Amino acid sequence: MTPLHHLSNPFVTQMLRPVAGLEFYGDPHHRYRYKGEWLPYTVTQVLDHDLKPFLRAQFEKTKHGPDGWKARGDAIHKVFANHLRGEGSIHDDKWSPWIDTLLAEPLLQDITPLAVEQPLVNTIKRVGGTPDAIFVKGDDIYIADLKTVSKKEGVSSRKEALPQLGAYLEFAASCHHGVYVTKLVTIIAGPGKCKVRFSELEKATDAWQDAWGRFSVLQPDF
C-alpha cells in the first residue's frame, strides 16, 4: 500500500461570494449551468478546439493510469486548494516532491485567498471557467493558474497559461465588481522544483480574445 501524507495549514480568509446561480459539474461532464440553463462553452473547450492532432494524441496517451497527468494534476490541485482554504488534506506520498516545493513557493507565503476553485462566467459569450485561485499579496490581487509537469526538467520549459488567464481576468471583472486584479501568474509545479511565470494583463487579454475569435467563428448562431 502506498503511504499517505497528511497536511494541515489553516488560513483566516474573507472569501469572495460565489456567483449566484452558477454551478459547475465536474467529471465526466465538465460543464457549467447558469440560472438553470447549461452554458454551451467552457474555457477549456475554447482553448482546446484547434489543438493539433499530434498534441491531442499525446495528451490522451499520457492522461490515464495511476501516474498519468490527470491523476497527478487532480491530486496536487486538491492539496493546493485545501491548503488555501485552510483545510487539512491527505495525499499519496508519491506526490510529495511536487507538493512540498509548491507549498514552499515564496509567492504563496503570507497571502490572503479570495477565491479557490470558484467558478466564473461570461454571460455574453456564455462561457464558464474556474481559476485555481484568486488571492491578495501585499498591494496586489492575483489570479493564479496551477500547472503540473512530470519531470523536474519540464518546469522551466512549461509556458505560461496566457489565454486561460486572460479569460479568467475578463470573467472576474464582470463577476466581482470592485475587485481589480493586478497580477496574473502561472504556477508550475514539478518534482522538487516550482516556478512562477507572470503574464502582462494586456497580453493575456489579447491572447484570450484571439482564441475566442478563432473558436466563435466556427460556432452556429443561436
Located regions from the model:
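Mg2+/Mn2+-dependent nuclease catalytic core
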Residues: 114, 118-222
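Metal-dependent nuclease catalytic cores that hydrolyze phosphodiester bonds in DNA/RNA
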Residues: 1-128
